[in-house]
Amino acid sequence: MKSTNILIVAALAVAVHINSLAQTNAPVTIAATMPAHVNVALIPVPRTGGITNRQTLVLERAKAAPGDYDIEFIGDSITQGWEFVGKNVWNEFYGNRKVINMGVSGDRTEHVLWRLEQGQLDGIKAKVAVVMIGTNNSGKNKDGTDAYTDSDILEGVIAIVNQIRTRQPDTKILLLGIFPRGRGFNPQRGRLLEINQVLAKLDDGKNIFYLDFGSQYVESDGSISKSIMPDALHPNEAGYKIWANAIEPKLKELLGEK
């Protein structure tokens, strides 16, 4: 498996940080008592509580129906929503294709990594994997600090991409930019925009393809209309129609359809 682009992204991030320190003549020091940062976005962990039922269902769904698929959708509640408010659109666009939904509400990158580790993709051979994950990593702690750094989230998404590439080397990955969130523009949405700019660099035109159509959910004044995202996060049927239309041309290309 080739991971050149992923390594380049990581190297560029480090280089930019070091260069910024050099330009300010700031000394680079490491405090002996400073604990090492642990990126929990990279540590596979299962869900707890009531959502474990959905987690188990998704795992068993894949294991109960191995074989060839046209498309697999991997993500959180926004992906899971295809089965509910997005059901009519799903049937319209994917009813004649063999497609599997692997979305679990509330999932963060570490939860998807756990599912992959548990064999989510074992026995599944998909032509295309549509992946969107990371919005649930972008929240705050109770004290108002970021629960995850931008680098944490990026590394978590990249780890998922690498896992899919390892477990399904013939699968094309359609990585989607994380959807905008919040009724008006806000710092969290700004973070996601910056994260998406880096994720775009993973597109190698061969195995990984990046697509960002989040702007289609945003009005000219920067707001997200209740007519497509009632809670400013999850699409309704009209919002899923935007999603389906946005990725359809690329899906046809990757699936070899006319």
Predicted region positions:
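Second-shell loop/turn segments in exported
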Residues: 99-102, 144-150, 183-186, 229-234
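Proline-centered flexible-loop/turn and helix-kink motifs
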Residues: 95, 169-170, 204
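Structural recognition of the beta-strand scaffold that forms the well-ordered cores
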Residues: 70-75, 98-103, 127-133, 137, ...
